[in-house]
Amino acid sequence: MPDITDLFAQRATLRRSTSLLTAFRFEQSAPERFYGTLAQDTVHLITDLWQQAEGVALRGRTVLDVGGGPGYFASAFADAGARYIGVEPDPREMHAAPQGHRGIQDPRTTYLRASGMALPLADNSVDICLSSNVAEHVPQPWRLGEEMLRVTRPGGLAILSYTVWLGPFGGHEMGLTHYFGGARAARWYTRKHGHPPKNNYGSSLFPVSVRDGLRWARDTGTLTAAFPRYHPKWAWWITKIPALREVLVSNLVLVLRPR
């Protein structure tokens, strides 16, 4: 029986992983470079999952991006023919795009200022609901997930992708110091740079595990697939190994299909 990840698995090569890893170095210094690469990869991910699930292209489908920031993904999804709706609670983030980036100004897209934990959309109103690297920044990540499921129509897809706390990128700009504890890492960062990290432990960065994500997703009865987002296909088995997955999975993708 075909798996919903079959198409994307063909794209999940070591070359892709290396390209994304290279881009990560520019998240803070050149965000347009990092997020541009990530946007294209995300469109490929969603397109492949949708094509495998529905047998049709993404064109004409409504995609809700929860925590869309300044709209780094907006134009990429619009270029793919999707009806893009972005949701972002922080007005500073909405306008944080570098000069020359259309983001929320792209006339083909719609943007809403709202919290992902209280989405201002009706039940069953979108085909695809995506949240990329947001769950670790909210104090109630599974409430965010429940809201995503609520607004996704039966048969649609909700894709929740988040950075794993004990993975190599869990500390974000604090680097690997998060392995000494989040609060301590934040203090060290502040001492070194003269200001707190943007992703500050306990206020804008929270520890989210693979175990808790899988447990929540299974309890919803809608889990269709779970895999490490940036790993090549031959390394996806890591997700099945407790403890090891918490350290080696940098980002977990949960694919949910409401019924």
From Swiss-Prot:
One of its GO terms (molecular function) is S-adenosylmethionine-dependent methyltransferase activity. GO terms for biological process: methylation. Pfam families: Methyltransf_11. Its EC number is 2.1.1.-. Keywords: Methyltransferase, Transferase. Belongs to the methyltransferase superfamily. This is Uncharacterized methyltransferase MAB_4481. It comes from Mycobacteroides abscessus (strain ATCC 19977 / DSM 44196 / CCUG 20993 / CIP 104536 / JCM 13569 / NCTC 13031 / TMC 1543 / L948).
